[in-house]
Amino acid sequence: MKPLVERINIAEIDEDLLTYDLNVVRCYKLIGNDVFLKSVDQGEEFFRDIHAFLNGLDDSLICTFVFKRINQNEPIVSRARQYLSKDKTIETLLFDDSNRAIEKGSMATDIYLFVQKSKKRKKTFFNDMAFAGLFEKEPEALALEREVLDQFDVKLSAMPQVKFQKMSKDQIYSYCYQSLNLEAPQKTNEQLFFKEYSLRDQLIKKSVNHHETYVQVGDHFVGSLSMEWLPVNAKGQLMHDLYYKNPNAQTAILTIEKASPEVVDELQSKKSLYQTFNLSDDADNTDTISNSSRTNDLQMAQEALNEGSEKLFISSFKVLCYSDQREDLKSVMSFTKNLLNTIDYAQFISDDFCHLDNFMSQLPGHPVHSIEQWVLSSHLAMFCPLYQPYQGTPEHPQFLFKNHWNELIPLSIRYGEADLNANHSMVVAPTGSGKSFFINHLIKTMRMTAPDDYVTVIDKGNSYKKICKVLKGDYYDIDFKPEYAMSPFPTKSDIFEGKNINKDQLIYIRQLVTLLIQDVNLKELSNAQERLIEKGILALYESVDSDTIPIITTFIECFSKVEATDEDDQKFIKTAIKNLGIYSDPDSPFSVLLNQPKQIELNNRFVVFEIGNLAKYPKLRNIYFFIIYNLVSLRMSDKERQQDIIYDEVEDILTDPTCASVVRRQYLGARKFGNRICCISQNIEHFTKEGLEDIPSNADIKYILKLKPESISCLPDIGFNENEISYIESSLQARRDIFIKYGDHAVVAKLEPSDLEKELYSTDFETFQKYEDLYSANDIENPLEIIQNNIPKKTPPKEVVTKGFSL
């Protein structure tokens, strides 16, 4: 017997009769559908009539009624079950709109009643108020089918209380499109590869009426390949081969849906597993090695689900190919299919995903030809390179991939799992592991998926100069220059609530003054000394108006007047004022930066602070870190926008106890403002020191790149289990893999940058020399074009490569 896919025929629509796969379909629209549901008695009589009607039909005829329950009329549904269940050949099922409410243990308002009389139930989509009749047996002649359907019309018209009307060709089209989920990508600035490409009624009609297996969009022809089986070991090679060896295979669509508990139970109980993956009616048609591989995959899935280390998903993978010529399209699809079928026994077939299968799958009682696979979460993540957009909704997630000449597309990093307490994150990325490419990509993702939110980066390695230029951000390369002068003291209007100072701001300024006055002879301060500093701060702000930016000189004047009767306190004040002199003396270079009535205005929503130039002055670097931290904290109170704060190369910051306490406090308190904190370090040890436990415990998202051997032993300290550690140690590849742990889940993503991404994200010495003019220029109209022109020329680039950065 031939495989199922070879038996699929092109649909023919003739007036109100539709034939498909040797079946004849006639569709009806229910008229006056609110009449019989107005009362329990009318509903009871109607279902009794249906019961009698179905029992009088030919056994080969499949009848499907789909009704929408109105006003939560529970007695009607109960009576329907009572009467329809008397005949064992009739099955009654209740579904909600999305066919998922039962899985969640709740019921939606809109519920459908599905009644089917047949020997074999078929998977079905449900829509409002419609009727369809199908034959399962192969007809001897079309005339016979018409005759039987005409007799059916007579019986149907004799039913009391309710009327059915034959659905015309246009009505059938409209009905079938009610459930198609063909929305464009959401919350991204990218467009599909054809501006006019949308699977709407007119495209489908044109393709079906002309018996074509592709969609014609303008001057282009689009065909589709579907994966019959998703191999576990395909990983990123599938994407790589698809896009780099065959650029004419322009787009691939991966739809993902979390498997229901029933599907998981079926997999764990080992029922019908082989049959699910055996895609032909004749087992001999399937390659023996492939069968063995599938069996191993299933056993692996069962073990992972039993351990609870994986989640099960249902996925469907399509590849769309396009060409200007019809014959060329056939060649492209043939070449692509042969290429993909060589990857770990992957099996692709040419299908009609673009029109026919999607259309016909909407008919009640008809089998769904969209091929779905069971796949574990980690294997699914290996399938996805990082340049991808999110499409759809949390209930219907989709990923749409583009090839390496298309615009850069973001990766969704805001995981929708309900068990995440906060979206704070941490990254462990040793030198040479691919950190610069990954973090640059995350930053671009943040800006493109939420352009109205704030993104603030504090760095010490000049890793983000180019991305800041391209995304029109503000870049502050802090040095001993007047333009980077920042007073440690905020304006009074920013930190006072009425007549009282904000308590958090008072603590911040006190900690900063403590940092300014500390030296080898003045390390630990007593509570009394800290209180003296707070009195000096309050006196400072009493002496200035609301819009004045206080400076260190003014603070010294106010601090010297603080009453201190104790001799030790008087000595402390004198020592503190003496230590502040290095910042207030006009001849000191530090006064140029810290003793000026200036503040950096953070008007741009994307800001990068580079403090690497202050590496020779660790105390000054920490002071600037404090000031920048407070500027960023003041933006937290903006209730209309969220904020991503990234601390890169934090090992020096976390070494200083005062600075480390600031980062720790942000991880604990930023969530209530809708802020997300991300710390990046080369070593796990920087996150496991005493007093820093709150960082890994509150970072619900952890990104691990290829680690050095000595760091593996620290993974349990930040919440990794034995299975995860084993994979990170043995299987994670440098400059390619990113192990992502979010909540109790873990996946592996592939770092596969395009040529433009490589040029944009690179941070080596040659790159800095190449783009020196770009860095020094204040305003460049199109910096991305300059970067694109420096890409090593392999093949002529397409114009679309720059579109992804339109904010």
What is the role of each PLM region?
Residues 1-385:
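Extended, folded cores of ATP/NTP-driven motor/assembly subunits in large transport
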Residues 427:
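Hydrophobic anchor at the beta1->P-loop junction of P-loop NTPases
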Residues 432:
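Walker A (P-loop) phosphate-binding loop of P-loop NTPases
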Residues 438:
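Hydrophobic positions on the alpha1 helix immediately C-terminal to the Walker A/P-loop
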Residues 445-456, 471:
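Post-Walker A helix-loop "phosphate-sensing" segment adjacent to the P-loop in P-loop NTPases
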